[in-house]
Amino acid sequence: GANAKTPTLSVRRARREEFVGGAAVVAKHARATGASVQFTSLLGDDAAGKFALDDLSAAGIDVFPVVDRARPTTVKEAVVVEGYRLLKIDVVDNRPASDPILRRLVEQVAGTDGGAVVFSDFRHGIFHGHSIARLVAAIPAGCLRVADSQVASRWGNICDFRDFDLITPNEREARFALGDQDSGVRPLAA
């Protein structure tokens, strides 16, 4: 039998909150400013993907999902006790998107009719060494190019988006990209 003295956390669920995260939050924030937003992302054919689509549509966002039946929609759960994040549980498939899926994503980017394209890079299958150049090349001429890079906890480099009009690294991402752990924050931003 199991050792009864193993450390085991036990918490009682008082409530459960569900909301979209990642790139969907960026889209909702842009929409909240009054912008017209077209949203494309890689989703699984599952309840979490449907939840994201419904939530974004309810926010007035035009959603153009690329569904991959071979992977789940990314779901991140946190167990929070008295305001402290005690445990994170992620359902995520970080494998690079297949070529047919990547082609569909490239087509969606190329068909953008807005004034800006925002790439939210969380390294969950869309952005990788094989895809970034193809996705960047698909951005229509004249669009403001923004990279909302979130690669501090995963392999990635904001320099992949070096020719963009705006990139949004945090301090850790900037230091990694520049190979600079010693400068103050202001020189990093220059």
Protein language model annotation of sequence segments:
Residues G1, R12-A190:
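Ribokinase/PfkB-type carbohydrate-kinase core domain
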Residues G1-P7:
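Acidic-glycine-rich active-site phosphate/pyrophosphate-binding loop
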